[in-house]
Amino acid sequence: MEDLMTGTYNTEELRRDNGGFMVPDFSIEVEGKQIRRSSKSGTLFIDSVCLKLSADAAGSLTFDVLNAYDQEARKFTDQVKETLKPGNMVTAKFGYAGNLIKLFCGYIHSVNYEYNETPTIAVTAVDMVRLMQDNEEDGRIYTGKSYTEVFQAVMKRYSSICPSKDIKTDSPAAAGEPLQIAQKGSDYTFVKDTLCRLECRDFFVLAGKAYFIDAARKKKSVVSLEWGRDILSFSCERNYVYEKLRVQMVDENRKTKSLEKEITFEGKHQKRVIPSPGIKNVTIDSEGDAERAALQMKKAVDEEKQKEVRCSGVCIGIPQIVPGRNLTVRKLDSWIDGTYEILSVEHRIDENGYTTQFELGG
């Protein structure tokens, strides 16, 4: 199977390989034990499941377990309580009969026992990002030849849930004299707001793998969707944007100086409210490294572009649609049709079938 970050598909192939999208299916394993989707007398089963993925938040998996209550003994069985306890490892695959793709690996964060007409256990699992958000190593000092090396040092604390073989990094933007850096805030804040900025990286966790990859990489479109065929609903919000990005650089002497290049952003299909753009100052910390400064500036530009357009939609269930990729939409309107970055995704399978909800930017 192709990596979720690199595979490209077309809907005709997906429709053919997944039996016309007719039989949605999923698999959930807790500590290696599978919980079935369909009911059999006396066995646990799940009738619906929802997976939320984001490039900027922890992934979460929610599902309700039925057939877990012993009516005669008036209790949830001990075996069930042992299986569905906080801290147990969970993996989830989504797709169609005979063709499932792993999208989530994490641990049970909360278990809610609901006593009603049909006693139910509601389970919420989260991925490694939640652990990183809750762990504050404020003031810890790291040394390394690159910020990628520092990132790998941070990730060693999570080797039990994400071993080194599941950490995907691009080559450092620059490597030279050993550097030293102090952590501020949680592990997640340190990686996301400091290391990603300094090394021009994107960081996210997907299907149990941690990605620390080039933010300026060319993001291929995972698939092209057509309204009326693949897209069930879609909305697009265009915002007023007219600003000049003025970039400042912190050099090796910790002094701030302005770069000569200024970039003006102006949204399409809009009228200027005032004749000149607003000014936004962005400071990049490249320690005098011109290559790193250029990469950080490109990342800042890409982030500003996200402000102009925000879209959301729902399509037939396609597990290959994940954050960190691009998505192409067609046959909506000539000024909307195009390729956008996937910001967040929700995969849901219930009595109504399998749908994928997405948020796009760019």
Regions from the language model: what does each represent?
Residues 51, 55-82, 232-362:
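An acidic/polar, Gly/Ser/Thr-rich interaction patch typically located in mid-to-C-terminal regions
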